[in-house]
């Protein structure tokens, strides 16, 4: 088994006569408690990198063995989005460490700092979660009542990326999305009931 976490892997130590392994990770940036993560399973690991100015940023993926090819095929989209956001908003916030994906079995994704947990390598989803590294991780809302700030920026930036890459399709899709949202009654950007996880992440 392999362990994935925030930051950089420092070392792995075998114990119990070589039957167990301890993985030591270190993250050197301030972090909100809800962004701390680790996962352990029979991951396959592959590495890549992206040039950001004068820095070569390691890109590290922990995925299920059966998902390796799809994650490898989707890597270029991550590199493209990383360069776009880096050039638009300044340095990737955790440029002295890494960015990567850790596959998990839930739907969607979670923007854990330096290590996004993700179910699949869907282009729109990976861009949305990457955008959170700037808006949601480096800076985050002071209360769950204002989570729309994190999600609003990430949603906007995924559209920003897709518009650059697929300009004609994105305009049509964006109009359809807006029509779908505005045709529904109710909804509020502010979350009044922060005890309801479903409400916190409700798009309405």
Language model features with spans:
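Active-site rim elements
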Residues: 66-73, 144, 196-204
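Hydrophobic helix-coil surface modules that form long, contiguous segments used
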Residues: 1-127, 156-159
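Catalytic Zn2+-binding segment of zinc metalloproteases
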Residues: 130-147, 160, 164-165
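Acidic/His/Gly-enriched intrinsically disordered linker/tail segments
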Residues: 151-204
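Acidic active-site catalytic centers that drive phospho-/nucleotidyl reactions
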Residues: 128-129, 151
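Glycine-rich, flexible loop/turn motifs
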Residues: 88, 106, 114, 143-144, ...
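Secondary-structure transition/capping motifs at alpha-helix termini
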Residues: 87-96, 140-142, 163-169
